[in-house]
Amino acid sequence: KEGYPVDWGNCKYECMSDAYCKDLCVDRKAKSGYCYKLNWFCYCEGLPDDSPIKTNGHCRPGGRRK
């Protein structure tokens, strides 16, 4: 699957570089990832089905974990 990876607080990961997002996504067993520069959040492609991605729901800061 693909989408915006989230932390434990359901918050997307902000970014400025593709390298940061690629590392973050690969750590989550994705095939690749990049910084989607229209909104400055990491986007992953090829994630496992059980990997959490952004859906409906609010971000609850304090759950940030790489």
Curated annotation (Swiss-Prot):
Has the structural arrangement of an alpha-helix connected to antiparallel beta-sheets by disulfide bonds (CS-alpha/beta). Alpha toxins bind voltage-independently at site-3 of sodium channels (Nav) and inhibits the inactivation of the activated channels, thereby blocking neuronal transmission. Expressed by the venom gland. This is Putative alpha-neurotoxin RjAa16. It comes from Rhopalurus junceus. Belongs to the long (4 C-C) scorpion toxin superfamily. Sodium channel inhibitor family. Alpha subfamily. Disulfide bonds join C11-C59, C15-C35, C21-C42, C25-C44. The lineage of its organism: Eukaryota, Metazoa, Ecdysozoa, Arthropoda, Chelicerata. It is found in: Secreted. GO terms for molecular function: sodium channel inhibitor activity; toxin activity. GO terms for biological process: defense response. The keyword Secreted applies. It comes from the Eukaryota. GO terms for cellular component: extracellular region. It holds the Pfam family Toxin_3. CDD domains: neurotoxins_LC_scorpion (cd23106). Keywords: Disulfide bond, Ion channel impairing toxin, Neurotoxin, Secreted, Toxin, Voltage-gated sodium channel impairing toxin. InterPro entries: LCN-type_CS_alpha_beta_dom, Scorpion_toxin-like, Scorpion_toxin-like_sf, Scorpion_toxinL, Scorpion_toxinL/defensin. Residues 1-60 form the LCN-type CS-alpha/beta domain.
